[in-house]
Design a protein with these regions (language model features):
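Alpha-helical membrane-targeting segments
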Residues: 21-24, 28, 157-186, 314, ...
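C-terminal capping alpha-helices of c-type cytochrome domains
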Residues: 23, 106-119, 130-156, 263-277, ...
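Electrostatic cytochrome c docking/interface patches
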Residues: 31-59, 73, 174-204
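Gly/Gly-Pro-rich "capping" loops immediately C-terminal to redox-active cysteine motifs
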Residues: 44-45, 55, 70-107, 124-135, ...
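N-terminal type II signal-anchor transmembrane helix
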Residues: 1-34
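The canonical Cys-X-X-Cys-His
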Residues: 54, 61-69, 142, 199-202, ...
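C-type cytochrome heme-c attachment and multiheme electron-transfer modules
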Residues: 118, 176-192, 197, 245-276, ...
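Extended amphipathic alpha-helical interaction segments
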Residues: 166, 186-188, 201, 211, ...
C-alpha cells in the first residue's frame, strides 16, 4: 500500500511540475510567430464588380472590428465585445497608411493574412477570423477594395495598439487555436441555384456566423465548422459596448429554444435590421443590411438542414440547462 501511495504521490508531483513548466513556457513564449504564408497569386485586378463586392464584404466582415466610427476609417480600435478571459484585444489599422497600416502590403501578403491569420511579419493574429472557406473571387474582392480609393481605406495615421493577451489566450494560441494552412487548390462558391449549399457558404465562408453562434470560441473548428462544439446552438459568451455579458443565440431550427418557428421574412428582418420577432437584437450582433433577398433565402434554406440543438439562451427568456 505504501508503495502504491508513493507512486501516486510521485505521479501527482510530476503532473504539477509539468503544469507549472507549461504555464511558464506559455507565459514566456506568448503568441507564437510563424513563417509568413506564400500564396501563389498574381496581382489582383480591381474590376468594378470586385470593388462593389469587396465593399459589401468589408462592411459585413471587417468593419465591425476595424472601422473607427468617429473617423470612418478602418484604423482599428479595442474590441470591447471580446471576453476579458482573452485579455485586451485590439483590431489593427488596415488603412493604406504606409507606416501604421497595410499600404505597403502586396496582394499576396493580404491573401495570406486573410486565409491563415499570419501576417507578412510572421505575427499570428489569433483573434482575426481565418477565411478558409471564402472563395478565391470573394477574397480577391476584399483585397481589391482594401487597395482602392474608398474613403474607409485611405491612409489613417493611427498606430495599431499592441495586443495584451491573457495567459489563457497565450495557452490557446499554442494549443487549440493555431493558424490554418493555405488552401491546397482553388476555392470556389456554390451558385445561387443551390440554395442550401450557397446558404452554407454564406454562413461558413463569408460571414462565419458559427464563430459566435456555436458554444465557445475555444472549441470552434475553422477547418470543419460543423465539428465545432454546439454548432450554431448558441451559448457563446460575449460583451456589449457597456461591458455587459451577452450570450449568443441558438440559431438552429429547434422550435422551443432556436429559430425553428421563425419565417424567412423574420430571419431577413433580424439579419438586415437587427429586429427579431420579439424585439430588437442587441450588440454585438451586426446588421447585414446589404444582404439580398436571394441570400436571405439561401441562409434560411441552409439553417433548416442544420441538426437541431435544444439550448435555451437568456434571450429566450429562460436560462439554459446545459
Amino acid at each position: 500500500m505504501k508503495t502504491v501511495l508513493r507512486m501516486i504521490g510521485l505521479l501527482l508531483g510530476l503532473a504539477v511540475v509539468a503544469n507549472v513548466g507549461f504555464v511558464a513556457f506559455v507565459a514566456a513564449r506568448g503568441i507564437p510567430s510563424y513563417a509568413p504564408p506564400k500564396p501563389a497569386l498574381a496581382q489582383v485586378l480591381a474590376t468594378p464588380e470586385r470593388l462593389a463586392q469587396g465593399e459589401k464584404l468589408v462592411l459585413a466582415a471587417c468593419a465591425d472590428c476595424h472601422l473607427n466610427r468617429e473617423t470612418g476609417a478602418l484604423s482599428g480600435h479595442q474590441l470591447r465585445d471580446v471576453t476579458p478571459d482573452f485579455g485586451a484585444v485590439y483590431a489593427s489599422n488596415i488603412t493604406q497608411d504606409n507606416v501604421h497600416g497595410i499600404g505597403t502590403w502586396t496582394d499576396a501578403e493580404l491573401v495570406g493574412l486573410l486565409r491563415t491569420g499570419i501576417g507578412r511579419d510572421g505575427r499570428y493574429r489569433v483573434i482575426t477570423p481565418k477565411f478558409v472557406h471564402m472563395s478565391d473571387e470573394d477574397v480577391a474582392s476584399v483585397v481589391a477594395f482594401l487597395h482602392a480609393d474608398n474613403a474607409m481605406a485611405q491612409p489613417g495615421p493611427t498606430a495599431s495598439h499592441p495586443q495584451e493577451p491573457s495567459l489563457l489566450l497565450k495557452a490557446l494560441s499554442n494549443t487549440v487555436m493555431k493558424p490554418v494552412l493555405l488552401p491546397t487548390g482553388p476555392v470556389g462558391a456554390p451558385t445561387l441555384t443551390d440554395a442550401v449549399a450557397f446558404g452554407r457558404y454564406l454562413l461558413v465562408g463569408r460571414y462565419q456566423c458559427f464563430e459566435c453562434h456555436s458554444k465557445d470560441f475555444k472549441t470552434n473548428n475553422a477547418l470543419a465548422p460543423e465539428k465545432s462544439d454546439g454548432y450554431l446552438g448558441g451559448g457563446n459568451k460575449l460583451l456589449n459596448a457597456q461591458g455587459h455579458e451577452v450570450v449568443s443565440r441558438n440559431i438552429t431550427g429547434d422550435p422551443g429554444t432556436g429559430i425553428g418557428d421563425w419565417s424567412e421574412a423574420q430571419l431577413g428582418q433580424a439579419l438586415r435590421f437587427g429586429r427579431g420577432p420579439n424585439g430588437p437584437l442587441g450588440a454585438p450582433m451586426p446588421k447585414y443590411s446589404q444582404l439580398t433577398d436571394a441570400e436571405v433565402h439561401a441562409l434560411y434554406a441552409y439553417l433548416q438542414t442544420v441538426p437541431k440543438i435544444k439550448n435555451a439562451t437568456p434571450e429566450d427568456g429562460v436560462l439554459a440547462s446545459k
